[in-house]
Structures are given as structure tokens and as C-alpha cells.
Amino acid sequence: DEEPKETCSDDMCVIYCKGEEFSTGACDGPQKCKCS
């Protein structure tokens, strides 16, 4: 299981904000992405 990354170019990746799945709105904390 790979750690979420700071950036990701794949549209299929899930964005995580503060460790939670995040898809819309403004993220006011650390944002990372994870590719399956």
C-alpha cells in the first residue's frame, strides 16, 4: 500500500485532505493524492 503523494497527474487518483478522502471544495490542510 503506497503512501499518498504530494502531486499526481492521473485523473483516477483520489485526493486526500488531512488524511480523509476529498473530492470537492477547498482544502485548508495538507493535500495529497493516492493512486490505486
From Swiss-Prot:
The keyword ATP-binding does not apply. The keyword Disulfide bond applies. InterPro entries: Parabutoxin. Pfam families: Toxin_31 (PF08119). Keywords: Disulfide bond, Ion channel impairing toxin, Neurotoxin, Potassium channel impairing toxin, Secreted, Toxin, Voltage-gated potassium channel impairing toxin. GO terms for molecular function: potassium channel inhibitor activity; toxin activity. Expressed by the venom gland. Disulfide bonds join C8-C27, C13-C33, C17-C35. Its main location: secreted. GO terms for biological process: envenomation resulting in negative regulation of voltage-gated potassium channel activity in another organism. Transmembrane segments: none annotated. GO terms for cellular component: extracellular region. It comes from the Eukaryota. It is found in: Secreted. Has the structural arrangement of an alpha-helix connected to antiparallel beta-sheets by disulfide bonds (CS-alpha/beta). Belongs to the short scorpion toxin superfamily. Potassium channel inhibitor family. Alpha-KTx 11 subfamily. Binds and inhibits voltage-sensitive potassium channels. Inhibits the vertebrate potassium channel Kv1.1/KCNA1 with low affinity. This is Potassium channel toxin alpha-KTx 11.3.
